[in-house]
Amino acid sequence: MAIESVREYFRQYGREQDVMEFDASSATVELAAKAVGVEEARIAKTMSFYKKEGDGCIIVVTAGDVKVDNSKFKHTFGMKAKMLKGEDVQRLTGHAPGGVCPFANPEGTDVFLDVSLQRFETVYPACGSANSAIALKCDEFFRYSHAQSWVDVCKRIEE
């Protein structure tokens, strides 16, 4: 089970007990915000994209109230944003849809955090299942996710 691999991953930091598991689904930003008890923007939304070349994928983690801006994505990564197909998600990220996170990923996974997260002291990414999360400060999140860099590839969702 992917949540167990993420718990094991956090053991190296002494944080395995901080992984929260909920009775209800936290697979979407809205559901995760309800489960955690925070505003939707503080949910760290993980999106996975195909790489330009080769196997593996790009994971971009954003605040819960933004969406990828295609022109910013293309400018940053030199290619169009093409999200992983459902059948490729588990193989390329190590996690099933709804539980994709930037922890315990297979080789070839490049993680980037969007600057939209930096508005918050603490954010809540998933932990490998559709009913899990962990509270992390942004500097911890960057370190634990082994992110390559902070990027600016999003825009606010129009209400």
What are these regions (language model features)?
Residues 1-159:
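Extended, low-hydrophobicity, polar/charged segments
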